[in-house]
A protein has these predicted regions:
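Residue position in alpha-helical solenoids
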Residues: 54, 93-96
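Conserved small/polar residues in nucleotide/adenosyl-binding loops
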Residues: 122-128
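Conserved positions within tetratricopeptide repeat
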Residues: 45, 65, 84, 104-105
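Non-membrane alpha-helical segments in proteins
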Residues: 29-37, 51-53, 62-77, 108-116
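Bacterial Sec-dependent N-terminal signal peptides
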Residues: 1-28
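Helix-turn-helix repeat elements of alpha-solenoid scaffolds
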Residues: 39-49, 79-89
Length: 128
């Protein structure tokens, strides 16, 4: 009987932890959204750094990637020449990750960024 109660408590606790983690990410993303609406790019950068570190600690690649992309976007607003730094960071992340799925997603994202950049250059050259 006691074993059954202990198992129930453990199972309930395991079900509660992910829900609490998701709520904390949701709360942080709501803060990011509000800062973005108020045109506070430095606040967005600070919050996305926090989300990235939290995702890294919890091994939550999806949150890490979302935070990294938002950070890149707002970092470009603050420092226009930071695009290449962000792209290099993505490339390093793709090289260092041990997860094949994460690596595939990162490589696909990097390829899309390069394709968009090439298209932008091509259309601007064609206009000249």
């Amino acid at each position: 009987m006691k074993i059954r109660q202990i198992c129930m408590v453990v199972l309930l606790w395991l079900g509660v932890i992910p829900a609490v983690q998701a709520q904390s990410f949701d709360k942080l993303w709501k803060e990011v959204e509000q800062a973005g609406k108020k045109s506070l790019p430095k606040t967005v950068i600070k919050l996305t750094d926090e989300i990235y570190r939290k995702g890294e600690k919890e091994k939550n690649s999806a949150q890490m990637l979302k935070a990294y992309m938002w950070r890149m976007k707002y970092q470009e607003i603050v420092t226009p020449d930071s695009f290449y730094v962000g792209l290099t960071g993505l490339e390093q992340w793709a090289k260092q990750t041990k997860q094949p799925m994460d690596r595939a997603i990162l490589h696909s994202l990097i390829a899309g960024i390069y394709a968009d950049y090439a298209c932008l250059l091509y259309t601007s050259d064609a206009a000249d």
